[in-house]
Amino acid sequence: MKQSVFVQQQGVECDFTGSTPWVILSPIEQSIKQKIEAVGTPLKDWDINIYRGVLTGYNDAFIIDTEKREAILANCQTEEERKRTAELIRPILRGRDIRRYGYKWADKYLIATFPSRHYDIELYPAVKRHLLSFGKERLEQTGKTYSINGEKIKARKKTHNKWFETQDSISYWEDFNKPKIVYPNKYMPFVYDEANFLTN
């Protein structure tokens, strides 16, 4: 079979028969990859954990700006509630906030009601009021579609979590309090975070 000019110029021979992972690279790229692998330790052999950021299922309700955070805290009835609530609302770095070797924090906060923490929403009435302002049906984790005042409202995906909790359990929430490397999912700028940001 005759090969096209493009295949003749750009084609690369690859061995897919081995048990090692394969990748299609030019000979120069293959050489660079082999040199890196010869001196480096594969990521799978490092003693680290790799996690994804927080999935809320509805960022409009759970990710808030400084003004909204202050309003929620101002609506707390006691100093004890205010302190609890302030600990629950944590700074977050979103993927779009990460730049090459740094970040530009957008003054955003996450209402960090992780299911693995087993929060009692009744201890956070100001947060409860804020979340309910988006409609309980919208925040439920049933996957159902509701019709309210002629408008179709889609609930978050079905889970066993409560309506006020983030979508994923985040059992590794304590690791957000450790230094970590953070990167977005669309492109690869990395930043080393020692400020205990949550990420999404």
Q: How should these model regions be labeled?
A:
Residues 3-200:
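Polybasic, glycine- and aromatic-enriched phosphate-binding surface used to engage nucleic acids
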